[in-house]
Each structure stands twice: as C-alpha cells, then as structure tokens.
C-alpha cells in the first residue's frame, strides 16, 4: 500500500516510535524486504568515499542518516559524482517525533 501511495504522490505518516529507520521504511513506498542501514557518513576523507560508493552500488533500499547542515552537499555529491539521479529518494526528518517532514523524489 505504501508503494501505491508513493507512486501517486500521496504522503502517509508513520506512528512515531523508537526506530527512525523502521518508521522511514514504513512510509517510503520502496521494496524493503531487503535493505541496508549505513548510519552516518564520515564528514570527509577516504572512509566517506568508501561508504558513498557502497551506497551507490547497493541494489536494494539503502538507508542512511545525515546531518541537516550537510544533507544538501551529500545529495549533490551523490547526484553529481555518482550519477544517482535515476534512483527514487525519500528524505525523512524528525520521523520519530510529532513534526514529521517527508520529501519524496521520483526519478521518472
């Protein structure tokens, strides 16, 4: 059902709980029987590059955290350097709290 809502630009809200990862997966509309959680990216350096390349090469749903002041730079880097503009994206903010923000980007 979440996938149909996503495809039709209908936003659904999770019941806030203990896990931001599970809450985001419950509303994203992506196939989530297989997913990987990558945590936070390193701020800079080789470790960041390695993790970004891992996310890009992952074929299933990928979940990661990013700081609000770095999210635009990270998304830009993923789009420009790694050419992931063809992948759907959902950005969730404050997903386990009352004021939830969900942004959906569909590549098609």
Describe each model-derived feature in a short phrase.
Residues 1-2, 81:
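Glycine-rich, phosphate-binding/catalytic loops in enzymes
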